[in-house]
Amino acid sequence: MSDPEDKPSRLHAGRIDGGSNDDNGLIGAPADFVRGALADRDPLPGTTGFAGFLAEAPIDDGTEPALVRDVLGRQPLFIDRGVEPGGTANDRLPRWSTDPTDLADPKPLPAGAVLTPGATMPWWSLPSPEPAAPSAAQAAVDRALRGVVGDLRASPTDDVAVAFSGGVDSGVVAAALPRAPCYVAGFEGCHDIAAAREAAAAMDRDLRIVEITHDDLRRAIPAVAAATGRRNAMDLNIAIPLFLVAEAAAADGFDRLAVGQGADELFGGYSKVVEPATDHRVEADTVRGARDETVATLPVQLERDVVALRAAGIEPLAPLLDDRLVAAALELPGELLATPAERKVALRCAAAEYVPAGVAAADKKAVQYGTYVSREIDRLARRNGFKRRMDDHVGRYIDSLCRESMMDDHSL
């Protein structure tokens, strides 16, 4: 595999809907570029993710029509379990879409997979390199981040806003987009709004606050559940703040929302990777192994986040999931991922070139807690008779809102 630092990222974005397999239909990268990645089996060819249909995909010794999804699942792609492929040369695959609501019975294509008329095959897998020496590993992250920031600063960004929580991830993304307004969502008094205000002042940035109310939650819960196909409390607690930020940015006329997704997984941002040998939440007993477990969760998480953002009318842009940063992160030794004193060590060091020291060092709460969304959905559930003594009281409340929303839709 050639050096990802030599591959400028293809910062393409957009949404496609499947159905007709007559032409190439790809999101995230040009067809010829993806064909090259298929032919080379290169998992990190220099994109921020791709998915879709290729009329002629180079598979083994020939070419076939195929559906593809990148190795980290950064672009979702769904197939319909209930529709059999057609019989013509250009209609030999199941019905598919980047939006699960287009399909009667959607199932995600696995990350890194290729689906041909004959089979679904794992095609790409993430590299598993040995850890590099600390100085070389840090230099690689520095170079990769410099390339990503440089590409963003050189690209047209008048249609981009930034989801901004005041931490190092969103701080670096905002620094790469110096003219973009920053948006933060949360309930009054929450951690994320306070941190975003402090960071925006330090960076001299325009901050727009989306103050969430209980009415917003009652409206957003069924909307996000319908868009993502998920009703569990954890997924909705995470996706709803993103959805509400995206709605606000879209209402202000922005087409894209830049997010910091992926940094915690790639760079050791979770507490469970610090001392994994004594942490029941991971199976690995090394920092690198625990980090790899969190990276493996990205495809499922990104399906939720990308679909929720698109449901709000905006296209996500996730520069910290650029192949160059992914490749550099995978070579980090454990000491540059997480220690008892600091998490995301290498990323914070690299970010110091772009953000104030306080932003580079800032602690970040998980979005569901930092915005108070998890707390307030629980409060709403209890106010509506779903007490904590009940099994899955929040899930039952979510189901009740979704049923009410469906009944309202049917009555129109």
Named regions from a protein language model:
Residues R81, P100, E265, K364, ...:
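Short linear motifs in intrinsically disordered/low-complexity regions
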